[in-house]
């Protein structure tokens, strides 16, 4: 997937929240409604954090979040998370991992995958071309 098909860091940070507090969210309906190869929506906010739903088929560019950890929880499919040091985590349904702030990473999915992300509402996303550790 071309890099310019993803939202800019500013667009990602400014995404509106879909559901206010005390609103029932049906994750199956939300996931079924997304037809794009990549879509990331803010479902809800809790204090200074948010719950995002991401649907991905293909790869997401290398990036990091300077001031925010990011927790991934796979709902459907299989998500690979590659770190700049070469480690790769493969998550299936109901598996989760937290990526610490300042950790360069990228996600990919060979087939349609739905995951939830928990992070700060104002989490900054910094995109990079390729991590230094992989320039060899």
Regions found by a protein language model. Name each.
Residues 47, 75-76, 92-93, 111:
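A cytosolic small-molecule/anion-sensing beta-strand core signal
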Residues 85-101:
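Short acidic-glycine-tyrosine-enriched beta hairpin
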Residues 101-129:
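Ligand-binding loop in jelly-roll beta-barrel domains
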Residues 36-37, 50-66:
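Conserved short histidine dyad/triad with adjacent acidic residue
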Residues 82-84, 108:
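A generic structural motif
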Residues 1-52, 132-136:
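A short, N-terminal "cap"/entry segment at the start of jelly-roll beta-barrel domains
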Residues 50, 59, 78-80, 104, ...:
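Structural motif
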Residues 55-56, 65-82, 121:
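Short, conserved beta-strand element in jelly-roll/cupin
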């Amino acid at each position: 997937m071309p890099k310019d098909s993803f939202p800019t860091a500013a667009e990602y940070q400014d995404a509106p929240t879909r559901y206010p507090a005390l609103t029932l969210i049906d994750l199956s309906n939300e996931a079924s409604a997304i037809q794009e190869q990549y879509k990331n929506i803010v479902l809800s906010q809790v204090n200074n954090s948010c719950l995002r739903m991401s649907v991905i088929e293909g790869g997401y560019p290398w990036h990091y979040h300077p001031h925010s950890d990011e927790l991934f929880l796979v709902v459907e499919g299989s998500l690979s998370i590659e770190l700049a040091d070469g480690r790769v985590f493969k998550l299936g349904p109901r598996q989760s991992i937290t990526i610490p702030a300042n950790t360069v990473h990228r996600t990919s999915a060979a087939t349609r995958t739905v995951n939830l992300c928990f992070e700060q509402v104002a989490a900054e996303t910094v995109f990079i071309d390729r991590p230094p550790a992989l320039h060899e």
